[in-house]
Amino acid sequence: MMMGSQQIKRQPAWFMLASEFGESTLNEKGTGEFDPTFVITKLGAKVNRLIVSGLVERLELRETSNGSQMYNGQIRDPSGLHYFSVGEYASESMREFVIQLLEKVDSGEPVLLTMTAKARWYQTDEGAVYTSLRPEEACIIGRDRYASWLVSASDATLNRLNQHQLTLNCEPTAEAMKDAGVAQEMIPGLLAAQTHYGQIDTETYRLNVMQALDIAEGKLEAATTPPPTLNLTETEDVTEQADEDLRSVVLECIQAMDNGE
């Protein structure tokens, strides 16, 4: 029993902006039954769980191909969108929460949400990669707590940017990274990221951090109201609907994998 407890030890949760997580196209899974799955970001974070916050931009109930129900949602932070889904595999408390959340969103009430979630990853037959979240815990928050999360996520992102910077002038080996001052826990992810992503442009992440901190300090208006509805042309409307349908299919595939775990 003790060995089993060690095998399913909960992984730490990362504070992370949507842009870093959403751009990830690399995952890693061990060979053991209880080995965790990681999404590896361009900055070398090996993410199994993460803490996100933002405005609930969309939430809807859909019926999957096998007849079960799934809630698909989007959370917007200053850097972009996180996608999440809550299905029949979720805890009773989470399902009850998302039902209440849907009522608020449908009423037009702007809702700031924070959640701790498992990182999910799916690759289509064509090779496209999509990330999403499976919420573990979530709650509605106010501006002050959102500002606190923005500071925490910005600080964590800057730390990963600094760690990545240390690797630019050293050989892509664990020993060289250690000698360069890279934190031991970041080395495996940074090595994998270098191999998969190659040279990356980090300027967007730095701009995301600056904007997040400006919002936290009250210099910019936080996103607490839904964005205005655009008058789309018929072609644009069809394209947007196709994108949403594809995202729903992907989330349904991820749910099916979760149900099989």
Predicted regions and their residues:
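Extended, charge-rich, solvent-exposed interface segments
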Residues: 99-114, 118, 124-240, 245-254, ...
